Structures are given as C-alpha cells and as structure tokens.
C-alpha cells in the first residue's frame, strides 16, 4: 500500500487532484448537511448543470472558465433561493427548470462552436488531469471560509437549518446565511466539476450527509461524520481510479454508495 501511495504521489497531477479533491469533498459534505436538512439537496444537481452551461460558453469564446462560471453559478444559486422563497414555484420545479435550461444552453453553444472538446468533456464527466494549481489554491481558500463558518457560526447555522422562524426571532439574519450557504455551494460545485464532472459533483453534497444520518442523530455528530466519510471515500475512490484506470468521479461515487450501505447495516444492527 505504501509503495502504491509513493508511486501515486510521484505524479504532480495526482498530488493536485488529491489535495484539491480532499478540500472540495470536505466543503461539499459540510454544506451538504445543511442543504439536505433544509430539503435543498437537489440544488447541487441544478447548479452543476448551470456550471456546465457557463463553462461551455467560456470555453467556446476563449474566456477564463472560473472567472465566468463562479459569478454565474453564484447568481443562479441566489436566484433559486429567491424563486423558492416566494412560494410561487416549488423548489424542485425551480431547480429542474433552471437545470434543464442551463444544460440546454451549454449543449447548443458547444454544438455551434467548438464541439465536444477535451475541456468540455472533462467538465461533463470529470478528469483527474483537469485540476490546476490555481484550483487547489482556490479550494484551500474555500475550505478555510467554510470551516470558519461552521466553527464560529455553528449556533446560528443550527438555528437557520432547523427553524428559520426561531432564528429570525433570536435576531439571526436568516437571508444572509441562506445566501452565504448557497454561494459557497456554488463555488464548491464549480471547483469540483473539473474532477468529478457535472453529472456526479452533486453526489459529494448528498451522499456524506445521508450516510452519516443513518447512524448519527445530533447536528454536530452528523457534521463531523459527514466530513470524515467524505474525505475517506474520496481518498479511496481516487486510489481505485488510479489502480484500475477508471474515471475518478464515478469511482468516488461508488465508494460513497458502499459507505451508505455499511452505515445502513450499522443502523439496522443497532435497532435490534
């Protein structure tokens, strides 16, 4: 095993993929706990399609992908909150509408311009070769922000997640925290798409939270477990991807599915 790790870490692209992937997995899992509990779990899937559309446009016109996609996806996240918040459109319908529309725009722009290039394909399906040094640096900055949010604003996040009316009554700026979570989720998705792909990046948000909820019942317990599960599953998935030459995104998702199954068995045993 140690020999395998030394071999993997001898490649700079593997080091970048491992470092950036672990940081993004941690961010996605922490934000995912709040999103799943607030029943916004599918927002990750919707924003990933928005991100694909924005990245496709950026690649087609030769613009900087991150400079285009981050503000676009962040704006889409805030728009989703606004639409679902006024109660006129259900959250799942709003996500499906924006998701399908953005994906359609991305496909049309790609077809009319560059075609399915390597860059566009990597955004759709993911590639461990796509993680750049700048992506790793941005992932580190994002991780610091997310960790600070959960450490220093834990009580407010707890209140906003479980009871927004109570949070408002205690003076918490609920809208600010909802927007903050949505924007951080958007940035996490954009950074993670290069490696996981638009089709699978939302799994980093959903799986760790749902897996941890099978065993842990407290908010803090779920957060700590989700972060641990996500990081461990990503590491195992990346190793399997390297050993068997399979896509990293798919490998990580399959490992997360295995973790969900194990935690479900533990839950069943504990109930007996």
Enumerate the language-model features and the residues they cover:
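Transmembrane helix-bundle core of multi-pass membrane transporters
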Residues: 4-16, 95-155
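C-terminal binding/interaction regions
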Residues: 4-10, 124, 128, 229-231, ...
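Loop-to-transmembrane alpha-helix initiation sites
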Residues: 17, 65-73, 92-96, 140, ...
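Generic alpha-helical transmembrane segments of integral inner-membrane proteins
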Residues: 22, 26, 30, 71-79, ...
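Short loop segments and helix-boundary regions at transmembrane helix junctions
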Residues: 33-116, 212-224, 241-244, 267-269
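Helix-loop-helix "hairpin" substructures at the membrane interface of multi-pass membrane proteins
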Residues: 135-208
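Membrane-interface capping segments at transmembrane-helix boundaries
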Residues: 155-156, 265-272
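Transmembrane alpha-helical segments in multi-pass inner-membrane proteins
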Residues: 194-195, 199-250
């Amino acid at each position: 095993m140690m020999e395998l790790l030394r071999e993997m870490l001898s490649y700079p692209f593997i080091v970048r993929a491992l470092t950036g992937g672990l940081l993004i997995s941690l961010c996605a899992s922490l934000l995912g706990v709040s999103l799943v509990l607030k029943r916004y779990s599918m927002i990750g899937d919707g924003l990933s399609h928005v991100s694909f559309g924005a990245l496709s446009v950026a690649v087609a016109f030769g613009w900087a992908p991150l400079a285009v996609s981050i503000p676009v996806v962040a704006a889409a996240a805030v728009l989703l909150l606004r639409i679902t918040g006024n109660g006129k459109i259900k959250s799942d319908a709003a996500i499906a509408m924006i998701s399908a529309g953005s994906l359609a725009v991305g496909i049309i722009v790609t077809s009319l311009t560059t075609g399915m290039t390597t860059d566009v394909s990597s955004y759709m399906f993911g590639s461990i070769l796509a993680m750049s040094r700048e992506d790793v640096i941005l992932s580190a900055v994002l991780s610091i922000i997310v960790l600070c949010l959960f450490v220093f604003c834990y009580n407010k996040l707890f209140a906003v997640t479980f009871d927004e009316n109570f949070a408002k009554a205690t003076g918490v700026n609920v809208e600010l925290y909802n927007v903050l979570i949505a924007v951080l989720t958007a940035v996490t998705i954009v950074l993670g798409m290069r490696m996981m792909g638009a089709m699978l990046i939302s799994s980093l948000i959903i799986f760790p939270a749902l897996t941890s909820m099978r065993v842990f019942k407290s908010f803090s317990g779920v957060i700590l477990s989700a972060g641990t599960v996500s990081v461990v599953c990503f590491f195992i998935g990346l190793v399997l991807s390297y050993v068997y030459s399979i896509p990293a995104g798919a490998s990580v998702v399959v490992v997360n599915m295995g973790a969900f199954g194990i935690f479900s068995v533990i839950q069943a045993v504990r109930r007996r």
